[in-house]
Design a protein with these regions (language model features):
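A conserved beta-strand element that flanks and buttresses the S-adenosyl-L-methionine
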Residues: 12-15
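A short glycine-rich, Lys/Arg-flanked "PGG" loop and its adjoining helix->strand segment in the class I
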Residues: 26-48
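C-terminal lobe and adjacent flexible extensions of AdoMet/dcAdoMet transferase-like proteins
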Residues: 111, 116-201
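Short "lid" loop at the C-terminus of a central beta-strand within the Rossmann-like core
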Residues: 18, 52-57, 109-114
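Short conserved loop adjoining the S-adenosyl-L-methionine
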Residues: 2-6, 21
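Conserved class I S-adenosyl-L-methionine
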Residues: 46-73
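Short alpha-helix
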Residues: 82-109
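C-terminal alpha-helical "lid/dimerization" subdomain adjacent to the S-adenosyl-L-methionine
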Residues: 64-88
Length: 201
């Protein structure tokens, strides 16, 4: 463990939390890890967690699980392959964060996922009818496991108000205190335009 002389305004865990069960003997590795992180934050500091959603729509369509490469592995509790990591649903992740001592959480939904997002929705700004046309969905070198086209299903997911459950990944802002002021509710990176017209809003 590294000792720090000062506490931090922000700490980011980008693709980190899911591996904590692999490198510790703790009975509650994810909660214990976040408690340590919490102790490194200033009183008004924030923790940002980026992680895959084990129930992400791409996985229901047959895309390989990001950590094991085995389709449907995460939603099957990794019983089909070697458990290299542990991902969570929105409800599970929120519960872990709250049990770790964080008072406030705010969920963002990077699309197509947190690794290469072109659009970021939030719990205060969800897609209304269709997902944004700026979203660049992944193509897979080996598409033999795919059983459906992810991009064509989102309309029905949105219509039935289950987008937050099926979002491919989460970006979670965690705070020690409530009422953190104004938040960004929607962001888009328009990088498919001519270079002089590219922008982020």
């Amino acid at each position: 463990d590294i000792e720090f002389d000062e506490k931090f305004d922000y700490i980011t865990l980008i693709g980190v939390l899911e591996y904590q069960g692999k490198y510790t003997d703790s009975q509650n590795p994810y909660i214990d890890f976040l408690k340590k992180i919490k102790g490194l934050l200033k009183e008004d500091g924030k923790l940002l967690i980026a992680i895959e959603n084990k129930y992400g729509l791409k996985y229901w369509c047959g895309a390989p699980e990001d950590h094991t490469g085995v389709p449907f592995d995460g939603m099957n509790q990794y019983c089909l392959g070697q458990k290299a990591a542990q991902t969570f649903s929105r409800e599970e992740l929120n519960e872990i964060v709250k049990e770790s001592g964080f008072s406030d959480t705010y969920f963002y939904y990077p699309m197509p996922d947190y690794k290469l997002p072109t659009v970021i929705y939030s719990e205060k700004y969800l897609p209304k009818n269709e997902v944004d046309s700026n979203i660049m969905f992944y193509s897979y070198p080996d598409n033999t496991t795919l059983i459906a086209d992810e991009s064509s299903i989102y309309h029905d997911v949105i219509k039935n108000h289950v987008f937050e459950f099926f979002a491919n990944s989460f970006l979670v802002e965690c705070s020690l205190k409530k009422d953190q002021g104004e938040r960004v509710i929607y962001a888009v990176n328009s990088n498919e335009r001519q270079k002089e017209l590219e922008c982020i809003t």
